[in-house]
């Protein structure tokens, strides 16, 4: 069983912001594999289904970003999901818009949602799928809570389009194969 988590903030005012790209990515997977995300529990909304022959749970924590780890801890404990089968999708300001980076472990890199997950799981050994949202030209909070510039929207759509295939690759062929295939991806 795999847990795919998209990070974001709840509420209409945060929709389509850079910080909510994880929610959008999980919505894309939900649509592509017909896994509705409608059940409310574990401090989030989730749904379960299959990608290929693997059972998967899709989760969008409804805590704010800096408390995301609480939601993950609850669902992981309930379903007894191995931490190495957890895939967290989130925004990364250190990657340019349209870039992807997959890692199997590591530090939080300054991301408060990832800090919360590492703290609550007491582990860094989960898979991270980072989506580039670009460096801020002004302060960080305004940047991540802001919407994408018109010229960036095409690149973001291109990235979101390949997310379901990327998730399939991680689940069926492993994270190393996904890294080989997608870590050099650049939306043009």
UniProtKB/Swiss-Prot annotation:
Its EC number is 3.1.1.29. Its main location: cytoplasm. The record marks 9 as: Discriminates between blocked and unblocked aminoacyl-tRNA. InterPro entries: Pept_tRNA_hydro, Pept_tRNA_hydro_CS, Pept_tRNA_hydro_sf. The keyword Cytoplasm applies. The keyword Repressor does not apply. It is found in: Cytoplasm. Pfam families: Pept_tRNA_hydro. It catalyses: an N-acyl-L-alpha-aminoacyl-tRNA + H2O = an N-acyl-L-amino acid + a tRNA + H(+). TRNA binds at residues 14, 64, 66, 112. Keywords: Cytoplasm, Hydrolase, RNA-binding, tRNA-binding. One of its GO terms (cellular component) is cytoplasm. GO terms for molecular function: peptidyl-tRNA hydrolase activity; tRNA binding. Monomer. PANTHER family: PEPTIDYL-TRNA HYDROLASE (PTHR17224:SF1). Hydrolyzes ribosome-free peptidyl-tRNAs (with 1 or more amino acids incorporated), which drop off the ribosome during protein synthesis, or as a result of ribosome stalling. Belongs to the PTH family. This is Peptidyl-tRNA hydrolase.
């Amino acid at each position: 069983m795999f847990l795919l988590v998209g990070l974001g903030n709840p509420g209409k005012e945060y929709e389509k912001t850079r910080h909510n790209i994880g929610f959008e990515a999980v919505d894309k997977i939900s649509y592509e594999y017909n896994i509705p995300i409608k059940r409310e529990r574990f401090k989030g909304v989730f749904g379960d289904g299959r990608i290929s022959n693997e059972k998967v749970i899709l989760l969008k924590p409804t805590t704010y970003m800096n408390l995301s780890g609480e939601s993950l801890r609850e669902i992981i404990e309930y379903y007894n999901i191995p931490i190495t089968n957890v895939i967290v999708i989130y925004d990364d300001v250190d990657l340019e818009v349209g870039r992807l980076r997959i890692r199997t472990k590591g530090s939080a890199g300054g991301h408060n949602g990832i800090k919360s997950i590492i703290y609550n799981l007491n582990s860094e050994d989960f898979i991270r799928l980072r989506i580039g949202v670009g460096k801020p030209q002004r302060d960080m909070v305004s940047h991540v809570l802001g919407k994408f510039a018109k010229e960036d929207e095409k690149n973001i759509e291109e990235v979101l389009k390949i997310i379901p295939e990327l998730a399939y690759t991680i689940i069926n062929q492993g994270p190393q194969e996904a890294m080989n295939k997608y870590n050099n991806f650049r939306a043009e």
